[in-house]
């Protein structure tokens, strides 16, 4: 009936409903609930074929590794670059700027996006600064060693033959600066996990 259908929809539309619903009795999770949910969701199968893509690895050295190309990361890289330090600026996005690209406020009398573009242009003109877009810092280890994964071919529909799809860089940095930004704090209220309910930052961005 419509009433029952609506009630069922309210339950099953909720994000992660199965983690909140199938909690009792505890012994049922492994033997009953989980197998049913896994079968309903479907599991992928390995093809068994060789990976056709090419992957590479390399080494880089710098005085300062800046992780994140938002307003803080751009400012830090620019300051260090102007001072003559060897700088590497990595960001997982294809375009530097971070939240500046989505916010309405400006910086220094210009829009955030224009300010970011101006800073990037100056960084590109400095021979001692290297920009690494589409790159993710995935690990930090002893002695200033950082692992950075650069996606060099994922965004290209038909990459050149022999060009690596990804490069794993071992970056030796005297200092590193984490400028990964912040996550908007979630405000808890009833049914806040239903589809269509977004935080203010997501509304401004999308």
Regions found by a protein language model. Give the residues of each.
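Single conserved hydrophobic/aromatic residue that forms the stacking wall/gate
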Residues: 1-12
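Feature captures the FAD/FMN-dependent oxidoreductase FAD-binding
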Residues: 30, 35, 40-44, 58, ...
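Short internal alpha-helix immediately C-terminal to a glycine-rich phosphate-binding loop
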Residues: 51-56, 61, 198-206
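Glycine-rich FAD pyrophosphate-binding loop
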Residues: 83-101
